[in-house]
């Protein structure tokens, strides 16, 4: 809480929205486990895109400053903001 003097309590609707988002993410991560060696980051992105669409969810990344994918993913030595 750097720079804050109080704790913001979430409302019941905010907590429900957070719970729903967590469930969608959990389902997307479970679906991604279907990936095997040789599974590309583009294929992983496609899995996430399908799960999000089926649940009526959207990606925070897709379209943000023209980012072309639903997920940011990096492999090996890449650290951040990898494009599948």
UniProtKB/Swiss-Prot annotation:
- InterPro entries noted in UniProt: Creatinase/aminopeptidase-like (IPR036005), Pept_M24 (IPR000994)
GO MF: metalloaminopeptidase activity
> Looking at the UniProt record for this protein, which Gene Ontology cellular component terms does it annotate, in alphabetical order?
cytosol
Q: Which domain of life is it from?
A: Bacteria
Q: What is this protein called?
A: Uncharacterized protein in adk 3'region
Tell me which species this is from.
Micrococcus luteus (Micrococcus lysodeikticus)
């Amino acid at each position: 809480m750097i720079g804050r003097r109080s704790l913001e309590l979430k409302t019941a609707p905010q907590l429900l929205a957070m719970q729903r988002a967590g469930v969608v993410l959990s389902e997307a991560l479970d679906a991604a486990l279907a990936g095997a060696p040789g599974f590309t980051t583009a294929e992983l992105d496609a899995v996430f895109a399908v799960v999000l669409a089926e649940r009526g969810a959207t990606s925070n990344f897709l379209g943000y400053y023209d980012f072309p994918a639903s997920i940011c993913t990096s492999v090996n030595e890449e650290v951040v903001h990898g494009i599948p």
